[in-house]
């Protein structure tokens, strides 16, 4: 069996994930429900990060268990679907951003998979997102849309509230382009787990103070932007195409060797099959 692709999203329609079944995956950090099925005809594991009934806000998600559950299922590449707001006036609702960097503005989340171990790791973040997975997302997205922005700084805030206008102005000055709440620490833990990770982020609103207040439902709302106007379907099509592109590509990025050199302390017993097993 080929290595399954992993998708982390808030929802996954039958279009994007076919032949689905649920699987409860035990991890050292707790048990996680994963949907197993096919994306574009290929094996896939999908994690609904807010829970199936959207009961978990970003600051309450068990990020360590989620990433480790995907790893236990053999996933090496994760696509993260992030509907987000824009901080940059040049990036408008309807655009699709494939981020190449991030700013971490979270406050209460675990810092590392190894926080409860007698070990720590200093992973390199020169390329915070997997370059190979990003390239596949960009190829798939530009084939279907002329509104793809191939670089961007994703600001991850704590939430669950939206930002204030002053916060948005501060994030603009710090170089942020888009803003959302669940990216960090997913991207960090994927790197610590030696998995590839990249984000596809449809823009569905402007940050506070850049436009009239956000409307959640009804005409002109964020939900209309995403679901009624076809953006959500487009994103799912791009994810399907990306899975097809990646399935036959050998990993040429360095994500699978992230622990080499930066690992200190005693290797926890749950850390199996990683680059620390390779010779010097
Ligand atoms: Zn990679």
Residue ranges and their predicted role:
Residues 208-259:
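His/Asp/Glu-rich mid-to-C-terminal helical/loop segments that flank catalytic regions of hydrolases
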Residues 71-74, 172, 191:
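Non-catalytic positions within long, well-ordered alpha-helices that form the structural scaffold/packing
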Residues 76-77, 177, 196:
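Short acidic/polar active-site loop segments enriched in Thr and Asp
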Residues 1-126, 279:
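Metabolite-binding pocket within alpha/beta catalytic cores that recognizes anionic/polar moieties
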Residues 143-177, 257-276:
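Active-site/ligand-binding-proximal alpha/beta "capping" segment
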Residues 181-219:
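Zn-dependent metallopeptidase/amidohydrolase metal-coordination segment
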Residues 116-161:
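Histidine/lysine/aspartate-rich catalytic loop segments that bind and position anionic ligands
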